[in-house]
Structures are given as structure tokens and as C-alpha cells.
Amino acid sequence: AFGKHLIYHFDSGEALHIHLGLFGKIRKQKLPAAESRGAVRVRIVGDTHLIDINGPNICEILVEHEFMDLINRIGPDVLRSDANPTLAFEKIKKSKAPIGRLIMDQTVMAGIGNIYRSEILWRQSVHPKTPGYRIDQRTFHRIWEDARALLTIGVEHNAIITVDGARASSRRYRERVNIFAKEVCPECKGKIRRFEISNRRAFVCEI
């Protein structure tokens, strides 16, 4: 994976490129398989299991040069060991765009979604509307490291968890987040303000 882009490589040299978007799903089941659910765009069958991919934003076959073009367009992925965070910082420090937009721009840094955006910036005391050029290297390093830590936890538990000590088994994500879609800041008890950045919900405590 590179951020939100999933890549399946085949012996032919081609690659299957998947971006699930907001509504796409990956379903894995043992063979023999039950009847498929919904509109299946791709079914990958192995010796013991199969994978169905439903409703992705992107579902395409890439040849080698197309795959390389895609990878070159994607910013460093906070979860990849070979990621170079300096590439993201170089773009951020030159930008007038708000940091809340920049860290969700997959060409700047890859992997951060909408809930993580508000949570990471709140945890690091950074207002989402702060222009990129006002983010110094130390602040960016904190954002990057927190993003990597939280996304690693998310992968391990298959759940978004940004509250220290929260249980992954809880079905209600509101119990696992600090300010996203909430009314009151857990730290200062001040009112959480909701607004939009690039037509996506964002949350901030301004006290």
C-alpha cells in the first residue's frame, strides 16, 4: 500500500490499483465462497480464500510505467519504513494552504484520513487553519510521528483509536476519539468548533 492506494502485483508485471474511497469495501472469505454481495468490481481467488472488492473509487490495471507514474505522484506514506518525511515538509513549508488541508493531500503526505486529521492536530495543539509556511520543522516532526503512531495502532486493531487506553473492541468510534464529531474538549471542557476544509468536516478546540 501507498497511503490509501492498494496495489496488487502480478507475475505478468501488471498491477491492480485500488482506491476504496469513502464507500469501498474489501471482503475476505474462505472457499468455497458464499454468493457475492453487492456489485463486485474485482474478485481475487487463491487456494483457500478469496477477496471481493466492492465499490472502490478507483479500480484499474496498470502496466509498469503507469505504476511508477502513480507512485511518483503520491507523497511519503507515514506507515512505510522507506518514507522520507522531508519531502512532505518541503511542500508544507512553501504552502499558504492550511495544514488541515495539506496533511490530507495525498500528494503531500499519504495515509491520513478525515478523522485522523482533526485528532492529530488537536493532540499536537496545531490549529487546522494554520498556513503550511508557519509550521516549523519541530512541529511537523511531532505531527508526522503522532500520525505514524496512531495509524500503526489503527492497523494493529483494525480501528481508529486516538484516545490513550481506549479499547479497540468498542463499536462506537466516539469512545475512541478525542474531539471528532464531539461537542466538548476532553482537556479544557471548552466547546469544540466544527467547520469545513475542502468540503470535509474538521473539528478544533480554540481555547
Regions found by a protein language model. Name each.
Residues 1-207:
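Structured catalytic/nucleic-acid-binding cores of DNA maintenance enzymes
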